[in-house]
UniProtKB/Swiss-Prot annotation:
HAMAP family, sorted: GlcN6P_deamin
UniProt name for this protein: Glucosamine-6-phosphate deaminase
Pathways involved: Amino-sugar metabolism; N-acetylneuraminate degradation; D-fructose 6-phosphate from N-acetylneuraminate: step 5/5
SUPFAM superfamilies xref list: NagB/RpiA/CoA transferase-like (SSF100950)
Name of the top EC class for this enzyme: hydrolase
Alphabetical UniProt keywords: Carbohydrate metabolism, Hydrolase
Biological process annotations from GO: carbohydrate metabolic process; glucosamine catabolic process; N-acetylglucosamine catabolic process; N-acetylneuraminate catabolic process
CC terms in the record's Gene Ontology section: cytoplasm
Role this protein plays: Catalyzes the reversible isomerization-deamination of glucosamine 6-phosphate (GlcN6P) to form fructose 6-phosphate (Fru6P) and ammonium ion.
Molecular function GO terms recorded: glucosamine-6-phosphate deaminase activity; identical protein binding
Residues forming the catalytic site: D67 (proton acceptor), N136 (for ring-opening step), H138 (proton acceptor), E143 (for ring-opening step)
Hydrolase among keywords: yes
Length: 237
């Protein structure tokens, strides 16, 4: 596991964007695993700027997002589908058919979970996976207690996670109770993983990860077993 400490959010975003830039330049048809929330916004802005500067192309890139809310329409301003288009996809030349997010509106959610993992496998697996980390150590929407061998599944969100995400909704009560998320084992199958975290609230989780204790009570700790993980973090002051 490689640790990179940064001084600012912008520096974190630039360092992470550089890793993704090099991946796409090395393999133009890369399969990328993407995340949502506040942590990756700056990195996506960097990637759009570098695309506009002619440094990379998304023409043959495929993307798979970690998660989506259950029961929220894709057209909703708070959906991760909308988030990804507003922050990245609308600013680059990615093909719509190469964009994949779990379908939280599927009639058969269990079948959608299996189909999502199958789509990732059919694409050749994820080359580079981006992660954030929750204050309780969740990755994707894999909350404490999630089995390490979990694949894409339906989860009930904890109160702390719903509170974290309430800023994206008009009312905290509007935050969905359930989500569809890539499981911890789904994430661990990625060839390379980059986790980004910045700010005082995230640092307690980073310190727990640094402790080296692996437990299902702290989902991100399973990353310690992955052979190719980079942690980009800062904001302790």
């Amino acid at each position: 596991m490689k640790w990179i400490e940064v001084n600012t959010y912008d520096e974190m975003s630039e360092v992470a964007a550089n890793i993704f830039l090099k991946q796409i330049q090395k393999k133009p048809n890369s399969v990328l695993g993407l995340a949502t929330g506040g942590s990756p916004v700056g990195m996506y802005k960097e990637l759009v700027a570098r695309y506009q500067a002619g440094q990379l192309t998304f023409k043959d890139v495929q993307t798979f997002n970690l998660d989506e809310y259950v029961g929220l329409k894709r057209s909703s301003p708070a959906s991760y589908w909308t988030f990804m288009h507003n922050n990245l996809f609308n600013g680059v030349n990615i093909k719509q058919e190469n964009i994949h997010l779990p379908n939280g509106e599927a009639e058969d959610l269990a079948a959608e979970c299996k189909a999502y993992d199958a789509r990732i496998d059919a694409a050749g697996g994820i080359d580079l996976q981006l992660l954030g980390i929750g204050v309780n150590g969740h990755i994707g929407f894999n909350e404490p207690g999630t089995p390490f061998d979990s694949m894409t599944n339906i989860v009930e969100l904890t109160e702390s996670t719903r509170t974290e995400n309430a800023i994206y909704f008009d009312d905290a009560a509007d935050v969905p109770i359930h989500a569809i998320t890539m499981g911890i084992q789904s994430i661990m199958k990625a060839k390379e993983i980059v986790l980004i975290a910045f700010g005082e609230k995230k640092m307690e989780a980073i310190q727990k990860l640094k402790s080296g204790h692996i437990t299902e009570d702290f989902p991100a700790s399973q990353l310690l077993k992955h052979p190719n993980v980079t942690i980009i973090y800062g904001g302790t002051n």
